[in-house]
Amino acid sequence: MSTYRDFTLAHRGSARGTVLRTIGTRERRSHLTAPRVPTVGIDIGGTKVMAGVVDADGIILEKIRAETPDKSKSAKVVEDTIVELVLDLSDRHDVHAVGIGAAGWVDADRSRVLFAPHLAWRDEPLRDALQSRLAVPVMVDNDANTAAWAEWRFGAGRGEDHLVMITLGTGIGGAILEGGQVKRGRYGVAGEFGHMQVVPGGHRCPCGNRGCWEQYSSGNALVREARELAAADSPVAHNIIARVGGNVAEITGPLITELAREGDAMCVELLQDIGQWLGVGIANLAAALDPSCFVIGGGVSAADDLLIGPARDAFRRHLTGRGYRPEARIAKAQLGPEAGMVGAADLSRLVARRFRRATRRRVERYERYAQLGRRDAAAGPEDQDQQ
C-alpha cells in the first residue's frame, strides 16, 4: 500500500484544476493544485459495504462488496470489514486516500460516527481508527452527504445551486448542498430527514422514536408491508408468496420492484404508497428549505416512475403555496447505488490534497532547520560566541 511519503514524492507538480477547498466543514471553489490520483470510496449501509477505486472524473475503476456485519456485532467488526476491502483493492491499485460514507450521524470534524441506527457505532472514532491501520488519509462523512456530492459533481444535480438529496435504502438519508457546499449544520448532523416524525405514535424506528418518515417511505417500509400481507396469506399476496416458495423472509425490495414491473397489483400499490409518503416529505422539505432540485437516490429509487411518479403527484398536492411559487425539480439520481461510494472517494481527494500540502510544509520546515543547523556547525563555537 502506498504511504503518504510515496504520494508526496510521486505527485509533486500534478495537474492544476478547479478543486474544492476544505475549511472546517465547508468546501469552497479554489484553483489550487489537486491530486488527480485514484482514491477509494466506501459506502456503508444497513445491508452491504461497497468499496471502489474511483478516478478524478468519477469513473469507477473497480468495486467490491461485502455484507454489513450484524448490528449485534461490535463496532470493530465493521472496521475490520472496511480494512479488508481496502487492502484487497490496494493489491491492484495505489491507494492514496480513503473516503467513508457512513449510514449514521457524523460529527462536524468528520472524524467520529456519533450514532448509527442500523450499526453498532456509538461515538465511534472511525477516522482515527482506520487511519492508524491503513497508513493513508481517511475522510468520514454521512453517506447521504457523499451521495449528494457525487450527484452534484457528476450526476443529476450538475448545475444546481441549491440541491437536496434524499436516499431511500434501509432507511432514509438526506443531504443539503448550496453554492457548492455541503451544509452539515453546527454539529455535523444536518439532513437526517428520515427521522422527522410524520405519524405520532406510529411504527417504532431503530433510532428509538416512533412514526419516523423512514418507517413509511424506505426499503424497510416496503418490505415490512409486503411481508405482513404475505404472512396474513392475503389474496393479493399469493403471487409473491408463490415466488418465494412460501418463505416470507425471502421477500426483498428488488423482488417487489421486479413483480411491480410485471404488473403485480399488490407490488404496484405498495410502491405507490411508498411514493405517496415520499412526496409528502418532499413537500415539507420544500417549505423549509426551498431548493431548486430534489435528487432521489438509494436502492429503492430503482423502481423509477413506479415510485417517483406517485411522489411527484403527492408533492404537488401537498406543496404549500402551489401555483404561486416556483416548483423544485424532482429527479432520479443518475449514479445509482454507487453514488455514495463515488462521492466519498471524491471528497477524500480533498483530504489528500490537504495532507499533501501539510506534508510539503513540514518538509520545508525541516529543511530550514537543517540549513540553520549546518550553518551553525560551520560557524564553530567561537563565531557563535561572538554573535
Feature map (PLM): residue ranges:
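Short hydrophobic alpha-helix segments
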Residues: 64-66, 117, 186
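Short beta-strand segments
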Residues: 43, 99-103, 141, 165-171, ...
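Adenylate-forming
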Residues: 147-153, 174-176, 195-196
